[in-house]
Structures are given as C-alpha cells and as structure tokens.
C-alpha cells in the first residue's frame, strides 16, 4: 500500500515538473520583442493638477545610488549593484510627464560635457565655413539656464526586512513556500539656484517583494536499492528597477504638493 502511494505521489510530482517545464518554455517562446516600459503610476502622474503659469525650468545633474548595496545572493560574493546606477533617467522622465507634461521644462545637465563639446564643434565649423558671410558666422542660440536644481539619490536599500515561509515533509515528500521583502528609499530636494536655499525635501519608500514555492521528493524504493529524487518550483521577483522608478515618481508628486502647501506655486484655477 505504501509503495503504491509512493508511486502515485511520484507520478503527481513528475506531472507537476512537466507542467512547470512547459510553462517555462512558454515564457521563453512568448517573450516577444522589446517594448516600451510604461510608468508604474501613469494615473497618479496625470492626476496632478496643471501648474498655474509657465513651465518651471529645472536641472538634474545626477541622482546616484548612495547605498553601496550589492545584489543579495546565497553563498556567493556578488559584485553587481542592488539598484540601478542610472536612476536620473527616471527622475527626468517623471518631471517631464507629471501633470500631463504641464509642470517642468528639464534642461540637459547629465550629459553636459557632450553638449558643450557638440556646441564647440558647431562654433568651430561655422567659424571656418561662414567667416566670409556679411554678418560673420551664425551664432548659436544661448543655452537655457534653470531656476531650480533637483538633487538627491537612492539612500537606502534594506534586504530581508521581512522573511517567512511554510513547509511540510512526509515520507520523503515535501513542499514549501518562502517570501522575502526588501525596501528601497529615495530622497529628493529642490534647491533655488538664485539663493542656494533648499526649498523642499521629501523621502519615499517602496517595498520589493519576492516569492518562491516548490515541492520535492527524495525516497528509496525496493528495499533501498532504487532512489527517486525530484524537485520542482517557481519564483516571482518584483523588478528592483521598477520599484525605484515608482519611488521616484511618488517623490516628484509629493514635491509638487508640498510646494503648493508652502505657496511656492499654485495649481491652475487657484
């Protein structure tokens, strides 16, 4: 009877393995081409009321990872950073999109060196090939300057803030589930260029959840002469990059509402 029960359990687990393998192949085969990555909070960004007045010119020089954290890994040393090293792109995108693109005019400062080199190349070319024109070489338009600078960065990444799971094993057959929660913290501050005063400062936090479930069997049959071993499972991990972007967008939204409360600006219609 026990042997029959073991065979039934083994068959069930092997059937589950086949299902997992088929689903894995489906994920690979149906991955599809590259696609645009949409905002985690498009409705929240769009729901911000428009600015009462002209767009605010703002500069972002960088938004760096100040945590120094590495990706969590079991039993090995991992030199990969836990969070993105290019989060300023999400800051710029959030500033451009918030309030249906009615709030900020972002000027290029992250690639300032490249911009200056290109402008210098244009000047040199015009000096050579347009010097005979009646009015001389065509001058370049002046670059926009910003009244505000957005500073800040990723200041915290805490691993295993919450860890848990459950499992059971009977006669060499077991199943288990596990979960883990990490958090990422983002800080932003708005600085006045004319005075150097920090006008606003906000901090936002986003959780990053991971979940794993699986089953396994380890059993000897026929008086210990035959070994049956099998394992199956799957895991779901929330993308860290997506969580960082969500925290950044929440910070931009909070800056706008705090600025309105401190009467730095007004919403349209007020």
Q: Language-model segments: what does each one mean?
A:
Residues 1-6:
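Bacterial N-terminal signal peptides that target proteins for export
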Residues 13-16:
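C-terminal motif of bacterial Sec signal peptides marking the signal peptidase cleavage site
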Residues 18-54, 158, 166, 178-270:
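C-terminal/domain-edge helix-coil "capping" segments
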Residues 56-57, 61-160, 183-187, 191-200:
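N-terminal segment of the mature soluble domain
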Residues 129-131, 173, 222-225:
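Short, intrinsically disordered/low-complexity patches at protein termini
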Residues 137, 172-176:
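Extracellular loop and loop/strand-boundary signature of outer-membrane beta-barrel proteins
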Residues 156-172:
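Charged, amphipathic alpha-helical segments
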């Amino acid at each position: 009877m026990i042997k029959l029960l073991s065979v039934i359990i083994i068959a069930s687990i092997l059937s589950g393995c086949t299902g997992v393998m088929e689903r894995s192949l489906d994920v690979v085969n149906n991955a599809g081409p590259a696609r645009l990555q949409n905002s985690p909070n498009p409705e929240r960004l769009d729901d911000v009321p428009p600015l009462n007045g002209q767009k605010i010119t703002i500069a972002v020089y960088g938004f760096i990872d100040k945590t120094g954290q590495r990706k969590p890994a079991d039993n090995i040393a991992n030199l990969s950073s836990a969070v993105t090293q290019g989060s300023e792109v999400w800051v710029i995108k959030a500033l451009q999109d918030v309030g249906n693109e009615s709030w900020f005019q972002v000027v290029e400062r992250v690639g300032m060196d490249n911009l200056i080199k290109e402008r210098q190349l244009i000047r040199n070319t015009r000096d050579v090939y347009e010097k005979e024109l009646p009015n001389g070489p065509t001058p370049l338009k002046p670059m926009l300057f910003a009244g505000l600078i957005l500073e800040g960065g990723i200041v915290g990444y805490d691993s295993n803030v919450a860890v848990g799971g459950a499992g059971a094993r009977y006669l060499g057959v077991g199943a288990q589930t596990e979960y883990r929660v990490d958090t990422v913290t983002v800080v932003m501050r708005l600085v006045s260029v004319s005075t150097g005063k920090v006008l606003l400062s906000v901090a936002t936090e986003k959780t990053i959840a991971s979940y794993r479930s699986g089953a396994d069997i380890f059993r000897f049959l026929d008086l210990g002469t035959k070994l049956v071993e099998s394992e199956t499972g799957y895991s779901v991990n929330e993308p860290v990059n997506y969580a960082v972007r969500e925290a950044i967008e929440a910070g931009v939204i909070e800056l706008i509402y705090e600025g309105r409360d401190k009467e730095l600006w007004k919403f349209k219609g007020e």
